[in-house]
């Protein structure tokens, strides 16, 4: 039986550094095997439910391609394609799907939803994103770091810039604490993560040799950084009345060439989970600018399109890292 067989993947809080390294090593192997035409199928005849209450490009494609590569059959259940939370409770949905499928992926709203699915389905459940966490993204991020940096994760100085209350920032902080990293947040104080989560991560970091630092001073936070990471400043499902104030508040935290230079590290890298606002080629960016007369770019196009950027390496690794999570928890390996 596999090392993590039948485990849920809900939060990196549930895993040890050894568990995370196992998934990262497996992701590397699966990527190499696919490229060399040597990939073995560990998920043959498995049926997988993909519940998407929130739309996605990278997460959906990664799960579907990974399932196909591994010989599994994936069924996509979109926000209009089920009775979840409308005519049927999460608990009842879990009990139904658990009798039809070998595993369930959920991308949607509250963390409690994915926890209820895990409790009542009796099959492995994978968190594709909730409002609170995005753990599959972090495995892809760490996989990319291991590929691109000639040093272990616990020697990497990683800075998250911008709105640090979101699911990506939360999951990164948890993952960094687990792996003993120097993790810093550069954000307005009003956009720091919850004090409860920060305390938990600091306690973990104390045991792993890591360090968690929060600062509203950009120069202080980014000095010596190996990685500058950001995410969008506004989300399309939010109350638009808060956008104008937030866009103004986050201007000093935009990743641009000036911030790159402030790191004093010529080998610094930029990362982003995507999608990104870096130019006016999307309707959403134009709409925000037209309505608020504020540029919504969390990163400049100059940085995004530069050699500093690892955004698309990171995006590619969503596939291989998600495949590793699936194989580790469900596969006959």
From Swiss-Prot:
Membrane spanning residue stretches: none
EC number(s) recorded for this UniProt protein: 2.1.3.3
Pathway this chain belongs to: Amino-acid biosynthesis; L-arginine biosynthesis; L-arginine from L-ornithine and carbamoyl phosphate: step 1/3
A biological process from GO: arginine biosynthetic process via ornithine
Compartment list: Cytoplasm
Catalytic reaction list: carbamoyl phosphate + L-ornithine = L-citrulline + phosphate + H(+)
GO MF terms held by the record: amino acid binding; ornithine carbamoyltransferase activity
Top EC class, one word: transferase
Binding site for carbamoyl phosphate: 56-59, 83, 107, 134-137, 273-274, 318
Main location: cytoplasm
GO cellular component terms attached to this protein's record: cytoplasm
InterPro entries, sorted: Asp/Orn_carbamoyltranf_P-bd, Asp/Orn_carbamoylTrfase, Asp/Orn_carbamoylTrfase_sf, Asp_carbamoyltransf_Asp/Orn-bd, Orn/put_carbamltrans, OTCase_ArgI
Keywords linked to the UniProt accession: Amino-acid biosynthesis, Arginine biosynthesis, Cytoplasm, Transferase
Record-listed L-ornithine binding positions: 167, 231, 235-236
Pfam families named in the record: OTCace, OTCace_N
Family: Belongs to the aspartate/ornithine carbamoyltransferase superfamily. OTCase family.
The protein's role, per its UniProt record: Reversibly catalyzes the transfer of the carbamoyl group from carbamoyl phosphate (CP) to the N(epsilon) atom of ornithine (ORN) to produce L-citrulline.
Annotated PANTHER family: ORNITHINE CARBAMOYLTRANSFERASE, ORNITHINE CARBAMOYLTRANSFERASE, MITOCHONDRIAL
Name of the protein described by the UniProt record: Ornithine carbamoyltransferase
Organism encoding this protein: Clostridium acetobutylicum (strain ATCC 824 / DSM 792 / JCM 1419 / IAM 19013 / LMG 5710 / NBRC 13948 / NRRL B-527 / VKM B-1787 / 2291 / W)
Gene that this sequence comes from: argF
